[in-house]
Regions:
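Conserved catalytic core of nucleotide polymerization and phosphodiester-bond processing enzymes
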Residues: 1-143, 153-525
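Core domains of carbohydrate- and sulfate-ester-processing enzymes
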Residues: 145-148
Length: 525
C-alpha cells in the first residue's frame, strides 16, 4: 500500500509555488486558437490546434513567439514550457488539456490562471460572465477593442477558416492582455493575503484538466435493469393515481385544485413570508411540485394520495433527468460519456459539474447528463472504463458537522463526534415524530435516515423555514449546539458591521447592504 512517504510532490506545492509567482525567473504566457467543435475542447477527438501564441518572460525581457500547426507540431512551445517555472493562461484548464494532448505531463506543470485569480479576489461578487479576459482586463485599466477575428469566433466561425492576418493579432492580443492582468493581479492577491487560495485553485485546475480525459462508464446490464424497473413502477403508480383521483388530468391546475382542496380536504400550505396560502400572480392556489410537497395529511385517503404522488414525481424526475439519458448512452455510445468540472461558477467558491452534450437518437437533439447532484441510488450504475481499474467513492463522514463543531468550539457536538452519535438518524427521528410531510410517508427507517440527511445541517446554512417539523428541528438544533449557533451569530454581526466576511481559511465574501432589523434578524445572511 502506498503512503504519502512514497509520493514525491512537485516542487511547487506550497510556499514555493507562491514564491515563484512573485519572483519568477522564467514563465510562459499562453493562448491557443483551435477548431471549435464543443467550444474547442481538447476532449473532442476531431478538434486540433490551429495557432499557438506565447510570451517567454524573464527578468531580462519578453520574447514573442507563435506557431501555426496542430498539437503534434509544437516542439518549441513544449521546450519553453518545460524550461519555465509556470504557465499563465486565462481559463487555463483549456490550455492545460491541449498541452496534455500534445504529450506533456500535467503533474509537472505549475499554472497560473488569471480567471481563477480574479474569482478568488472577487469572492462572491463575480459571476462567470464577469470573468472573461476582456472584463477582467478592463477592471485593471486595460481597455480592448473588438478584433474582427474575435467577432467571427463569437459568431461561430471556426478559427481554421479565419485568415491568418486576422487571427494572429487577435491571439497575440489575448496573450499580452493575460500578461498585463497577471502582473497586476498577483501583486494584489499577495497584498490582500489571498495568494495561497489562488495557488490552491491553480493546483486543482491542473488535476481537473487531467481527470476530465477519463470517461464515465455505465454498466449496460444494470442500467437496462433499473430502467425497466422504474418504468414499470411509474406506469403502475400512474394507474393507481388514476383510480384514486377518478382519472383527472394531473396537469390541469383547475382539476388538481378541486380534487385536493375540495374532495380530499387538504389545507393549502402556507407561505411563511405572506402568512397566506401559496398563490399564482392571478390569485389561484399554486399546485407546483414544491408547494404540494408541503401538504400535510390527516386522513388515510390523504396519506394514500401523498404516498403515490410523491413517489410518482420522484420517479418522473429520475427517469427524465437521469435514466433516459443513461439508456441512450448505453444503446448508442457503448455506455461511455464525458463530464466536466466547472470552475468560477458558484458563489461559495466550490466546483460544479456538468456533462458534454451528446446527440442521441432517443431525443433527436443533443443532451447533456445531469451530474451536479447524481442520485445516490444510481451511483452503482458506474463501473471502471478499463478492466485493470476500479471505481470507488470517498466521503468524509458528517464532514460539515465536524468542521462546524471545531469552528464553534462546541462541546456538545465534539462529544457526540467522539461518541459516534448518528446525527442523521436523530434528524430522521425528529422529522418523523413531528409528521414532516416528506419523511412521514417513508415506511423504512433506513430510507428515512437517508432522505433526512439533506436537512440535518440546514441550520448551518441559514435554513429555518419549511414544514412545521423542519422549523421545529432547526430551532432544536440551534438550542442544542449553542457553541455553533453563537459562533454563526457572531459572524453575522461582523458581516452586518463590515459588509463583508473573511472565513477562517481566508476566503472573503461580500454582503453589501447587510443590516440588522428591529427584530434582530440580519439581512443577507
Amino acid at each position: 500500500m502506498y503512503t504519502m512517504k512514497d509520493v514525491e510532490l512537485p516542487w511547487f506545492v506550497g510556499k514555493a509555488g507562491m514564491d515563484a509567482y512573485l519572483n519568477f525567473k522564467q514563465c510562459v504566457i499562453l493562448d491557443y486558437e483551435t477548431t471549435n467543435i464543443n467550444k474547442g475542447s481538447a476532449l473532442e477527438p476531431d478538434n486540433e490546434i490551429v495557432l499557438a501564441c506565447w510570451l517567454v518572460v524573464t527578468p531580462e525581457g519578453v520574447t514573442q513567439k507563435h506557431h501555426w500547426g496542430n498539437q503534434y507540431d509544437q516542439s518549441e512551445l513544449e521546450k519553453d514550457v518545460k524550461e519555465s517555472q509556470f504557465v499563465v493562461a486565462h481559463n487555463a484548464k483549456f490550455e492545460l488539456q491541449w498541452l496534455k494532448r500534445s504529450g506533456l505531463e500535467l503533474r509537472d506543470i505549475l499554472v497560473y490562471d488569471t480567471m481563477l485569480g480574479e474569482w478568488v479576489r472577487g469572492g462572491n461578487r463575480f459571476k462567470l460572465q464577469h470573468l472573461s479576459l476582456e472584463e477582467v482586463g478592463q477592471r485593471y485599466g486595460y481597455g480592448s477593442k473588438e478584433e474582427i477575428a474575435g467577432y467571427l469566433i463569437k459568431k461561430g466561425v471556426c478559427p481554421s477558416d479565419i485568415p491568418r492576418e486576422w487571427l494572429l493579432p487577435y491571439c497575440y492580443r489575448d496573450v499580452e492582455l493575460s500578461y498585463l492582468v497577471f502582473q497586476e493581479q498577483v501583486g494584489a492577491l499577495h497584498k490582500e493575503e489571498l495568494l495561497h487560495l489562488a495557488l490552491t485553485r491553480n493546483l486543482c485546475c491542473a488535476a481537473l484538466a487531467d481527470m476530465e480525459f477519463n470517461p464515465s462508464q455505465l454498466d449496460a446490464y444494470e442500467v437496462k435493469k433499473v430502467y425497466d424497473e422504474y418504468v414499470a413502477e411509474f406506469q403502475e403508480l400512474e394507474r393507481q393515481l388514476a383510480v384514486l383521483t377518478g382519472g383527472i388530468n394531473m396537469s390541469s391546475n383547475k382539476q388538481l385544485i378541486e380534487f385536493l382542496y375540495e374532495k380530499l380536504n387538504f389545507s393549502p400550505p402556507i407561505n411563511p413570508r405572506t402568512k397566506e396560502p401559496f398563490k399564482t400572480p392571478k390569485g389561484d392556489l399554486q399546485v407546483t411540485v414544491d408547494v404540494l410537497a408541503k401538504l400535510e395529511s390527516h386522513t388515510s385517503e390523504q396519506d394514500k394520495f401523498l404516498q403515490l404522488y410523491v413517489r410518482r414525481n420522484k420517479l418522473s424526475a429520475l427517469l427524465s433527468k437521469n435514466l433516459e439519458f443513461f439508456m441512450g448512452i448505453v444503446e448508442e455510445k457503448g455506455g461511455e460519456f464525458f463530464g466536466r468540472f466547472n470552475q468560477a461558477t458558484t458563489d461559495t467558491g466550490g466546483l460544479s459539474a456538468s456533462g458534454f452534450q451528446v446527440l442521441l437518437k432517443r431525443f433527436g437533439e443533443p443532451k447533456a447528463p445531469q451530474l451536479q447532484n447524481l442520485p445516490r441510488e444510481f451511483k452503482y450504475l458506474f463501473t471502471a472504463h478499463d478492466e485493470d481499474e476500479l471505481v470507488f467513492e470517498w466521503d468524509g463522514s458528517q464532514l460539515e458537522f465536524r468542521v462546524a463543531a471545531d469552528e464553534g468550539r462546541d462541546p456538545v457536538a465534539q462529544q457526540e463526534i467522539r461518541d459516534g452519535v448518528d446525527v442523521h438518524a436523530f434528524t430522521a427521528q425528529v422529522l418523523y415524530e413531528n409528521k414532516d410531510p416528506e419523511i412521514s410517508n417513508i415506511p423504512d427507517a433506513g430510507e428515512r435516515r437517508q432522505q433526512s440527511k439533506k436537512h440535518t445541517f440546514r441550520p448551518l446554512f441559514g435554513g429555518g423555514s419549511g414544514s412545521k417539523a423542519l422549523v421545529a428541528y432547526c430551532e432544536y438544533f440551534k438550542d442544542k449546539y449553542q457553541g455553533i449557533s453563537t459562533t454563526q451569530r457572531n459572524w453575522a454581526l461582523t458581516t452586518a458591521s463590515k459588509g463583508w466576511f473573511r472565513t477562517p481559511y481566508g476566503m472573503k465574501f461580500y454582503f453589501p447592504g447587510t443590516k440588522m432589523q428591529a427584530s434582530g434578524y440580519i439581512t443577507n445572511t
